[in-house]
Amino acid sequence: MKKILILFAKDWDQIAIQAKRDSRQYQFYFEGFDLARFPENINLLFFKILPFIKKLERKYQKLGLDGIVSNHEQFGALIAALLAQRLGLPGNDPLAIIACQHKYYSRLVQEKIVPEAVPKFSYIPYPLDSTKPLDIAFPFFIKPVKATYSVLCKQINNWDELEQHLHFNYFEEWLIRKLVQPFAEVMPLLTPLKIDPNGLLAEEIIEGEQMNLDGYCQNGEIHFLGMIDEVMYPGTQTFMRFEYPSRLPEEIQNRAKEIATKLLHGLNYHHGFFNIEFFYQPQTNDLKIIEINPRSASQLVNLYERVDGYNPYDVLFALAVGETPVIKKGECSFQTAASFVFRHFQKPQRQKKPSIHEVKQVLASYPDANIMFYFKKGASLEREFKWLGSYRYAVLNLGGLNRTDLFKRFGLLCQQLNFIDPLIKDQHLR
């Protein structure tokens, strides 16, 4: 069996890994911890990236690994590239990872390679300096230079809103810096970059339809898996669902692939999965890059399995051990699939988490369904509302014979789970 190290495994990774364990094709090893779940996230207190990499290098040199995988944006993707380089295993160039993950530097590179696909942008240092004028006019959209899951992403209309948005208590500021610290320690060792990753990226506001382009590179050759539509909750910039296949015209999808190809070659992105988010503006027919992520979108890739009949994790693991992936699209039960995100936009008075028995009943009725729960309370709930503007309490992946069947199954499943928020029930209208 090939030996694969999984770094900072995510809940969606575990579904695919369990299936592969049963096949006895790979032997998996795990390192890292879950930033979102207690008590694992206590490890963040003591986490130091360079000693962590050195420890793994010593440990796995003796074991004889065949490959390393991570779909973890915050720490895992960069560590996987660095560790693969040290152990002589297949992996991406750490410089390409940094060029993707440092969102301001990434914009500078994008501007050189595909300027037509880049919105106006500017860097804002943190802490704010009210004596220095901004290089971008209000209103603008702001996001951290180094972050994930849309944390602290928001439209800002004036200086007061900016100050309020970036006002943190002692623990919040410590947590933010602690999450960025590993990247900040590695960046100057590999690059001459001086732009502090604790700062923020401000961008002109773009409206339009959002989509996600998935694919992978091997030896510099680019392969696309497909495009997924990103649908927002009405009147927000918050994901409501991800739907495959995309309903955008083929011509638009092909243009996105052309932009992605130029960008990936320009970044020297030669190995591993990627996902690139785009805005499409129907009025102007423009495509703009939102961001590029140097990893698989683990929440979304099993949508391809439902519709196209192959598991992208098979591709991911083959890449990790240096094999050429073979994608065999097969007959499948579904023509469409979606990842539905359940959210509250106001603090719930009372949360009723479905019992294990109720969840088992749902999965018995819908064996293709995958559902994850993220219930929070107390300070964690308060922080999620502050940092994300909403509270994500569950995610459901589901297939359908067609879109009508997809939303019918979704509605019936919601009834069984007692998820009856009107915003959820009206998904089919978006």
Regions picked out by a protein language model, each given a short descriptive name:
Residues 255-276, 294-351:
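Active-site "cap" helix and flanking loop/linker of ATP-utilizing ligase/carboxylase catalytic domains
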Residues 345-377:
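Glycine-rich active-site loop/lid that clamps phosphate-bearing ligands
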Residues 49, 53-63, 85, 95-141, ...:
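N-terminal beta-alpha lobe that positions the nucleotide/phosphoryl donor
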Residues 154, 164-166, 200-204, 210-231, ...:
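Beta-strand scaffold of nucleotide-dependent catalytic cores
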Residues 1-96, 127-130, 322, 374-384, ...:
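ATP-binding N-terminal substructure of ATP-dependent carboxylate-amine bond-forming enzymes
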Residues 270-283, 427-430:
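A short glycine-rich, hydrophobically flanked beta-strand micro-motif that places a catalytic Asp/Glu
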Residues 117-119, 159-206, 238-239, 261-266:
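Conserved ATP-binding module of the ATP-grasp superfamily
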